[in-house]
C-alpha cells in the first residue's frame, strides 16, 4: 500500500542549511543570499527558502562561484620549504612533501599536488583529492596565473618588464610574463614580482636568466585566487570556501 503523500519525508536538505554547512555564510545570511537571487542550483536561480537539494548531486553556485558540497573532498595549501622535492614519495630517500604532510593530513596517498616546484624553490603548492579540478588547474589551456617573488643578481633596468611581456626565446620556445614589477632593491640584488600562467620546467629561473638576471632565491606566492599570505614554510592549511569556488570558476567547473 502506498504511503500517504503527507507522511513522506521531504527529500534533500534545505538549501540554506547546505550553504551554512559548506562554510559560505550563517544560516540567516544564506537565507538572504537565496532571497536576493544570488544562489543557483543546477544552473537555475533559486529564491525560495523551502528549496531542498541533494548535496551529493546538486551543483550549487553563489555569485557564480561553485560551492563544494562533497565533504570527502580535501583542498589544502602548502608552503613548500626550500630543499624539499614536490612528490608524495621518493624512492631515493630524499625529503619530499609526502613526508611533510603525512604527519598532518590523513589519506595523503590519494592527494594530487598542483603546481610542482623545484627542490630549490619554495612557496605555494595546492593538494587535493579532487581529480577533475587538479587536472584542469595543471592544464595550460586554462591559463591559471601563478605569481612569484624572485631575488635576482644585479640592478634591474626600467624596461625589463616590457621585454619580458613581449617574450624571450628559450630553448623550448618563447616565454612571456603576464605581469612584472620591481618590489625592492639593494646594491647588487633586486626583488621582483613575476606573474605568468605557463608551467614549463624552471620557467621563471630560465626566463630571468635569459634576460641577464640569474635568480638567487625564488618563492611562489599565488596560484589563481589562492595566496600564500603569512603561511610559514612547512605549514599546511585548508582552503577557504571562497578560494575553492574561485578555483572552480577559473577552470570552468
What is each PLM-predicted segment?
Residues 2-253:
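Basic, flexible Lys/Arg- and Gly-enriched helix-loop patches that mediate nucleic-acid binding at interfaces
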